[in-house]
Structure formats: C-alpha cells, structure tokens
C-alpha cells in the first residue's frame, strides 16, 4: 500500500479529487481505465488499469485524516501503475 501525507485534510482532498478526475478521464492510449467506481460516503474510488488482456491491475484509493491511501488489489503491481498514480499528484505539487 502507498500512503501519502499532505499536511491537512483539505490538501489531501484536493490531491484525491485530482487523481480521481485523472482516472475518470482515461486519457492515455497506452492503456485504458475500466471499472471506475466511486463511493462518496467513504471518500474512495476503485479503478482498473488494463494494458492488454494479460496485464490488468485494480486499485482502491481513499483519504482520511490528511493521508491518501492507494492500495493495489493484487500484490504484484507494475512500475507503470505507480507512475500513473503519482503523475497527477506530482503535477499538482509543482
């Protein structure tokens, strides 16, 4: 699991919303985002990254108490997934 702290719940919520919007847009031709599902009551969303039929990875993202949590549903995630997840966060912080 990846845990990222941003100092305040408001900052964490902004990063969460940025990542959520990034995942919803499915902007990249190299892979597709499928099965996007948001749970507003729990400040969470789940999505799947599909590179091709053999490489499909699902993630759950949520925030609480100033911490953004990113949890893969499988233990064996790939570097590209981490880059995808951290890109909008890094862009926001620049």
Regions found by a protein language model. Name each.
Residues 1-44:
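Negatively charged, low-complexity tracts enriched in Asp/Glu with abundant Ser/Thr
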């Amino acid at each position: 699991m990846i845990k990222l702290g941003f100092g305040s719940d408001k900052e964490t919520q902004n990063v969460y919303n940025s990542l959520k919007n990034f995942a919803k847009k499915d902007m990249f031709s190299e892979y597709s985002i499928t099965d996007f599902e948001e749970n507003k009551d729990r400040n969470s969303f789940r999505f799947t990254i599909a590179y091709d039929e053999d490489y499909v990875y699902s993630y759950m993202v949520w925030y609480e108490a100033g911490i953004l949590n990113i949890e893969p549903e499988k233990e064996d995630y790939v570097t590209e997934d981490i880059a995808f997840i951290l890109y909008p966060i890094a862009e926001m912080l620049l």
